[in-house]
UniProtKB/Swiss-Prot annotation:
Name the UniProt record assigns to this protein: Zinc finger protein 695
Domain named KRAB: residues: 4-87
Gene designation: ZNF695
Known function: May be involved in transcriptional regulation.
Zinc finger C2H2-type: from-to: 156-178, 184-206, 212-234, 240-262, 268-290, 296-318, 324-346, 352-374, 380-402, 408-430, 436-458, 464-486, 492-514
Record GO cellular component, one term: nucleus
Localization of this protein: Nucleus
Keyword Glycoprotein found: no
Gene Ontology molecular function: DNA-binding transcription factor activity, RNA polymerase II-specific; RNA polymerase II cis-regulatory region sequence-specific DNA binding; zinc ion binding
Residues spanning the signal sequence: none
Cited CDD domains: KRAB_A-box (cd07765)
């Protein structure tokens, strides 16, 4: 075999592609390049064609090595000359399909080249395993998307709505949404969208195409995001867990064998749906789903449940017991699932993304609620006044206006509230605590939602628009009040004289006339 060229073991990036890498990825690149260089030198291969890389970078060999060892940015040196030379030359296109681009990890490219060179004596780093471990530790890293931002910085700002984005692609999506244009139309169902990606995904649903297949479990998906979520399940701590015996397996194939053994032992089958169980007691519990039977009743409020664990969880509402504590901030929860969701606040993980606007959430329920903003769906309707809500909890809270129920009482002044969060907010009046501060003007607030509303004064954002007259508002409550002008609704009634008002503030002023 001829002299080994540095290009055979090097992965090069253009200035534009270098900008897409985050600090951790750049650090990995430097470590690999320097170690491979030292390994080649130690084997006496210092006569290989190093001039390829160094000439492309328009600098001498010592300068580049010093630059990398000093952990400086290689593309900051001699920018004018390097701008004329794209180091990512045809050598990469020999190994990578054009449509893959940067979506090929460091490891895959390097392993291909090492195998091609047959370097049995050369001990090069096995970065496939290294990054596999790194990926498990760094949840935000995605080995198949080097351009994804792994930090929480938002360097791209929309000049229309002043929103910040960590990805340039998301900024482009935001700009298109402001124009109101939806040039992409699905030929099958006629749906329109402002993004071609959504239309591509839509068409895949119609034709049944699932191009993203998981090598671990064999599942196929029509969206890359769903494929990514599947991979996260496999690399997680409990990626292949058997629901029957709670054992965890390294591979899904091992899990499949165990699950098959469980299935063969299941002799108790439900006549209603065909599901099988290995214990008669489990089948009995399952049948309650079909019959609607709820034998476990709460002695406090009379609410019934079909399973005893559900009753146990419910009782914590009355006892205020919260056994699950966050190690990060000390906050406690009554359910383990609530703690799991809360932990994502600290990790910054937002795995649930809206296909319409690109906004991400740390809970699937929040995404479901958010989608109703785009669809305008309000499935929860008040039987008293007909008002509809996007979330069931909002309806429950609203009903207390009609019933007058205020179960949460302040121990300081005796004032009662319809919701526990209102009591928490009220308590800050006594303590004087205002933890939420505006970065623009320094004004502080005792509730985060007040800060969010206040920020719109600086940005000029008015996201809540009246469908009747087109008037826009910075707060949803202002829109709700405004709508009563069109509907002539007066839900706030004086108990003394029966006079009705469309705003609670007006009722409060009126009530003072009686006192």
């Amino acid at each position: 075999m001829g002299l080994l060229a540095f290009r055979d073991v090097a992965l090069e990036f253009s200035p534009e592609e270098w900008e897409c890498l985050d600090p951790a990825q750049r650090s990995l690149y430097r470590d690999v390049m320097l170690e491979n260089y030292r390994n080649l030198i130690s084997l006496g291969e210092d006569s290989f064609n190093m001039q390829f890389l160094f000439h492309s970078l328009a600098m001498s060999k010592p300068e580049l090595i010093i630059c990398l060892e000093a952990r400086k940015e290689p593309w900051n040196v001699n920018t004018e000359k390097t701008a004329r030379h794209s180091v990512l030359s045809s050598y990469l296109t020999e190994d990578i399909l054009p449509e893959q681009g940067l979506q090929v990890s460091f490891q895959k490219v390097m392993l291909r080249r090492y195998e091609r060179c047959c370097l049995e004596k050369l001990r090069l780093r096995n970065d496939w395993e290294i990054v596999g471990e790194w990926k498990g530790q760094k949840a935000s890293y995605n080995g198949l998307d080097l351009c994804s931002a792994t930090t929480h910085s938002k360097n791209f700002q929309c000049n229309k709505c002043v929103k910040g984005f960590s990805k340039f692609a998301n900024l482009n999506k935001c700009k298109i949404s402001h124009t109101g244009e939806k040039p992409f139309k699905c030929k099958e169902c006629g749906n329109v969208s402002c993004m071609s990606l959504i239309m591509t995904q839509q068409q895949r649903i119609h034709i049944g195409e699932n191009p993203y297949q998981c090598k671990k479990c064999g599942k196929a998906f029509n969206e890359c995001s769903c494929f990514t979520d599947c991979k996260r399940i496999h690399v997680g701590e409990k990626h292949c867990k058997c629901e029957e015996c709670n054992n965890i397996f390294k591979s899904c194939s091992s899990l499949a064998v165990v699950e098959k053994n469980h299935t063969e032992k299941k002799t108790y089958r439900c006549e209603e749906c065909g599901k099988a169980f290995n214990l008669c007691s489990v089948l009995t519990k399952h049948k309650k789903i079909h019959t609607g039977e709820k034998p476990y009743k709460c002695e406090e409020c009379g609410k019934s449940f079909k399973l005893f664990p559900y009753l146990t969880q419910h009782k914590r509402i009355h006892s205020r017991e919260k056994p699950y504590k966050c190690e990060e901030c000390g906050k406690v929860f009554k359910l383990l699932s609530y703690l799991t969701q809360h932990r994502r606040i600290h990790t910054g993980e937002k795995t649930f993304r809206c296909e319409e606007c690109g906004k991400a959430f740390n809970q699937s329920s929040h995404l479901t609620e958010h989608r109703r903003i785009h669809t305008g769906e309000k499935p929860y309707k008040c039987e008293e006044c007909g008002k509809a809500f996007t979330w069931f909890s909002y309806l429950i809270q609203h009903k207390r206006i009609h019933t007058g129920q205020k179960p949460y009482k302040c121990e300081e002044c005796g004032k009662a509230f319809t919701w526990f969060s209102y009591l928490t907010q009220h308590k800050r009046i006594h303590t004087g605590e205002k933890p939420y501060k505006c970065d623009e003007c320094g004004k502080a607030f005792n509730w985060f939602s007040y800060l969010t509303n206040h920020k719109r004064i600086h940005t000029g954002e008015k996201p809540y628009k009246c469908e009747e007259c087109g008037k826009a508002f910075g707060q949803s409550s202002h829109l709700s009040k405004h709508k009563t002008i069109h509907t002539r609704e007066k839900p706030y009634k004086c108990e003394e004289c029966g006079k009705a008002f469309n705003h609670s503030a007006q009722l409060a002023v009126h009530e003072k006339t009686h006192t």
